[in-house]
Design a protein with these regions (language model features):
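Bacterial N-terminal signal peptides that target proteins for export
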Residues: 1-9
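Hydrophobic alpha-helical context, especially transmembrane and signal-peptide helices
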Residues: 8-11, 155
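Surface-exposed, beta-sheet-biased, low-hydrophobicity segments with strongly acidic/polar composition
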Residues: 22-194
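C-terminal motif of bacterial Sec signal peptides marking the signal peptidase cleavage site
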Residues: 17-20
Length: 194
């Protein structure tokens, strides 16, 4: 009888132990840093670019334009990325159409680069570019459902969506500055998951 009781207790203990053990399904990927930011950009197409670093979530000084400290530059409606003719980095861009929040995995290949001053990775053409231009109000609106997947100058991955482009209030006929508001998810560990 003692033997039967010990076997029953051992069986119950074994079952309880198996039930209480859970497989660790945690993911070791560091979550992407998600932010909303805005930068002021010169409206004048002859003005210097405004450079931005996703890693530092900050505007980068023009004196660093020949370094990998920035990921994209912006002037008027023209983006440049830090690679090929525009900089020494390894940045690339995929213009993506779809739902920004649903995009969770950056591609390993297929990135576009700035190949000439008129062949930029992010198209800024009036009819083919990333924005819609309203000739009555002179407003630039980002195309709905379009965002960018960016490999940064130092090989990290970002998804970025432009939320709005507005003029800084101005006197006279021509604006001086545009304010770009955008949100992005930056993967600091170099993985491609957002």
């Amino acid at each position: 009888m003692k033997s039967l009781t010990l076997h029953i207790l051992a069986g119950v203990s074994l079952i309880a132990g198996l039930i209480s053990c859970k497989k660790d399904t945690s993911n070791n990927t560091i979550p992407a840093v998600t932010k909303t930011d805005s930068i002021q950009v010169a409206f004048d197409p002859a003005a210097p670019n405004t450079f931005f670093s996703f890693k530092n979530d900050a505007v980068v000084a023009n004196s660093d334009s020949a370094t990998t400290n920035w990921d994209f530059g912006l002037r008027n409606v023209n983006f440049i990325i830090n690679s090929h003719i525009s900089g020494p980095g390894n940045a690339g861009v995929i213009t993506q159409t779809g739902i920004y929040d649903s995009y969770t995995q950056a591609a390993q290949s297929g990135y576009a680069y700035d190949t000439t001053s008129t062949q930029l990775a992010i198209d800024a053409g009036f009819t083919t570019g990333w924005y819609i231009y309203n000739s009555t109000t002179h407003a630039f609106s980002p195309k709905a459902g379009q965002f960018f997947v960016i490999r940064t100058a130092d090989n990290h991955y970002v998804k970025m969506e432009i939320l709005s482009v507005n003029y800084v209030p101005f006197a006279g006929q021509v604006p001086v500055t545009l304010i770009y508001k955008f949100h992005f998810a930056y993967q600091a560990d170099g993985s491609t998951t957002f």
